[in-house]
Amino acid sequence: MPRSSATARKNQSNRNENGASSGKKVAKQKSNGHLNGSLNGGSTPGSVSSSQVDLPSSRSTSDSAIAPAAAASSNLNGISDSSKEDCNGREKLNGYTKGNADMSYVQTNGAGSQNGGDHAGQASHRTDKSATGAKRSTSNASINPLQLASTILKSCPMYDTIAILIFLLQLPPMVLTLVQFLFASLTFMPPSGASAGSLSSNFDIFQGPAGTPSLSTMIAMDGFCLLIWALLMWTWAQNFALDLAHVQVAITLGGGGSGKNGGVNTLCVGIVLILHLIRSKGIQDFVIGHLLSSNIISPDLLAQYSHLLPTEFRRTESQTSPSWIRSLLAVHILAQAGTAMARRSMAKNRSPNPPRPGKRVDTEASAGSQTQIDSAFESGASVSSYLGPDGQLITPTAHKDGRDRLLSAKKRRRQANQVRSRQPFWAALASTKVTVMREYEHSRALSKTARGLPMTENDLQGVSFDDGLVWITDVDASTIKFAAGDFASADDSGLSGACEDGRLGNEEIEPFYVCVNGALWATATISRVPDAQKGSGMVHWRGEVSGLAPNCAYTCSFMRSDTDEEICAISVKTPVTNDTEQFSLVSPPPQPSYRPSSPTTTLKNSIVNAEAKLNEKRSRLRKAKNDHKLIISKIRKELDNYNHRLHSGTDENRQKQRSLQLERNIRQTEEATALLEGQLDSLENIPEEELREWSDQKAKYDQELQLLNSAKEELVSARSAVAREVSSLESDLGSTVQRRERLQSRRTRVNEQYERIVSANAQGLNERERRAAEQFAREQDQAKLEANFNEQFGSIGQSVQEYQLRAQQIWQQCDAIEQAIQQQQQRMLLDSAPLTPEGNLPGTNPFSETSALPLGALTSTAPNSRSLLGLSFPAIKSSPLQTISSALDASSSHPTSPVQPPSFLNFPASPLVNATSHLDSDFTYRDRSFSNRSARSSLYGSEFLDSSRRQPFQIDLPELLGEKRNSGSDSTALKSGLRPVSSPFQRAGSRGSGSGSNGSGGSGSGSGSPSSAYGKPN
């Protein structure tokens, strides 16, 4: 609950919003309490910029000491005291006034007015008013202790925790799962004060940003506990862990973990353990089994006292495993509880030494607020003191002590979050309500000031100034400029007229005065705008508050001069000075303050600030004087040096000095030359030992060089050999790859063929059966045809036999005719005469004279030639049924030599041929007659007879006989060893073709070339 400002300023309130004890109480402390706390006891300090003005903590409506004073004061605007108290009880932001919150604005960019008027009597007048303010503050200090105690809620963490645990154990499973889910989701929310950049950093393994574990730590702990949960825990242990999660939720919501001892934790865990011992069969079996195995109790004793347990507590069935949703939530809650315990233990190890005895330290106050050092002003400041960030005086001893105790911003934020996490549930709700209300008031104030934009005096047109209005026009590092409207009313018409006529003194024409941090500010100047008229102008008064310290928070209170009533209070923070040289000797403080100081502290800060400025200017002046003195002395020295050189130096002296310098240089050069010549002489004579050593080293070098060259040659040869091997292997590899590719292509083709064959076979199963049926039908037809052909062959064989008999008779007749012709030819040859009177022609050789051969040889037929008349017949194969062969057949079965004519050609000369003819000589000796056939016209050519002789004309009898044969076979040929004579008149189809039949009851056919039948007996 918020306290009154007067009470806070006097008593240094010792309670915060959570009911915990505050920091140490400083005796006779006159500064404002909660210097670094937020408004209304909030935990987060509000940062106020230089362009934004905030009001201090307002007085509560329960402040009984303020009500009489407010009732006694006069009301210029006709507003009741209760409404003023209500307005004063609310928190005023952005310069809202006490009387009318809608008429209060803050202007930071307005132009400040010139300070006009005479201010000679202001100091004495405000000194008289200070006594009245002191009396009012004394009267406000009287507050009822019972009323103050009734506003504080007592903290009972043990009772709250046990009550919440009992409530959670009675909830149904669905609602309990929802509660656990909401509680688990709170662990993933970033704490207050955590930035986006700090969420990605890890302070250490258990301590994350802003006092919370990092996301990676939470995930790792959840995974580790989930692994233990799934692998190493029984069913009864999982159910027990679920209830332990309820204990963690109850301890967190009830604030049971904020105590120094673990009594609440032990009590809650004991309650859950006793319940499970009574109701869980698994735990009973587990505990009893261990007790019996360790011989702590005997089975008889256990059976004796087991009947005392009520029947409803005896569970016969085992508990089922919890659902995976509740298991995940319980694992997460227990894992974060273990992480919190580890972080607390580490925080204890990291915490500084405990404070000295007799001092009480508030954890939250030390984490969220700055150490108060205002007591340094009360005890007196030394000469070596300097200003703090808010204008406070800090001695070296106090600064060293405070610097040791101050924490970094991150560590303080972490500690504040740790303290906030230990707050009970009702305290968190109260803090949330206060924060929401504060933000609501702040947003409403911003909306009324045009979304926080800086306002000018032109923006205040149409605003009522009946109750008076004060606003800030400019805020500087050491000054605050403000403007005010008209404060005169109907009741003060006489006073207003006197002010306008100038009949009153300078002290009485100022309707208000300024107090800074509760102290009457003597350096505040207020001047009236001369051109402003009543009701027609907006700005009637302008003023300036000077003598302030930069980067400090101030509360400027505007008080009425006649009634000492507070018109409004505005909180302003001066910006940092732009002068970089100012306060260069003062080291920067550890942490700036955003709350105003006490009146005494403010006055002392102002005095010290002015003295510091004066000292700074004096030090600058002294430093400038010293610098100027040093520069002047340096310039004078240089001037004296130049004058001395100018007056003392002549041409002769300069030439002498130059000659001496040259002589000195020449002497040094000669000495260096002599030294170098001595070194050269010593280097020309080489010692024998060094020469021998050099030769040995050179020989070793040459030997090593030869070894190196040989090694290089071996390396080159080895590289070439390896290169050849590599090239051969590469060629083998290439050939192998090509062969492999060919085999692969062949394999691909074979696979394709195989697939086609398989598909064809699969498709041709029915075709095969059809073909088998057709083949069977064809075989039957062929069997019928074969039987028919056999019958025909039998009839043909009989006809062939008949033809053979007839052919034999014809051959006999032919033999007789041929014999007669041969005889006639012989007689013609014997009786032949020369064809010319001169005798034989050259080149002719009569047969009677030149040839020693018998006459029968002339008519003989060589195997490859023809007879004279062409009546030689080829051999005719006889039928195998023929049993009687003639003498001609016998002689023809054994062919003779080509030179010797066969015996059947030696026929006796016919008597008809004895007569000579006039054609004999011409027939005999004419080489180119028709009868003189060329050997080249025959098939085989004449090899033994004289080719120049004219051969007798022969008749191709086999051709004549072949025309009569229907079958075209040569079965009727004569059985002779003569080769068939081919004639140009013979058909091509009759050459080398023949057929025969077997007379043994069978029939057959054959074919062959003429040469194949030669020399083969039948």
UniProtKB/Swiss-Prot annotation:
Q: Cite the record's Polar residues compositional bias ranges.
A: 1-21
Q: List GO terms (cellular component aspect).
A: membrane
Which keywords does the record carry?
Coiled coil, Membrane, Transmembrane, Transmembrane helix, Ubl conjugation pathway
Location in the cell: Membrane
Keyword Hydrolase on this protein?
no
* Compositionally skewed regions (Low complexity) per UniProt: 45-74
Is Membrane one of the keywords UniProt gives this record?
Answer: yes
Residue ranges, compositional bias (Basic and acidic residues): 82-93
Provide the membrane topology annotation.
Multi-pass membrane protein
- Where does the protein principally reside? membrane
Disordered: annotated segments: 1-138, 342-371, 581-602, 962-1018
Coiled-coil features, chain-numbered ranges: 601-788
Q: Which residues cross the membrane?
A: 162-182, 217-237, 258-278
- Give the highest taxon in the source lineage: Eukaryota
Q: Where is the composition biased (Gly residues)?
A: 991-1007
- What's the stated role of this polypeptide? Component of the regulatory network controlling carbon source utilization through ubiquitination and deubiquitination involving creA, creB, creC, creD and acrB. Involved in resistance to acriflavine, and required for normal growth on a range of sole carbon sources, including fructose, cellobiose, raffinose, and starch, and reduced utilization of amino acids, including GABA and beta-alanine, as sole carbon and nitrogen sources.
For this chain, the family text in UniProt reads: Belongs to the acrB family.
Q: What is this protein called?
A: Probable ubiquitination network signaling protein acrB
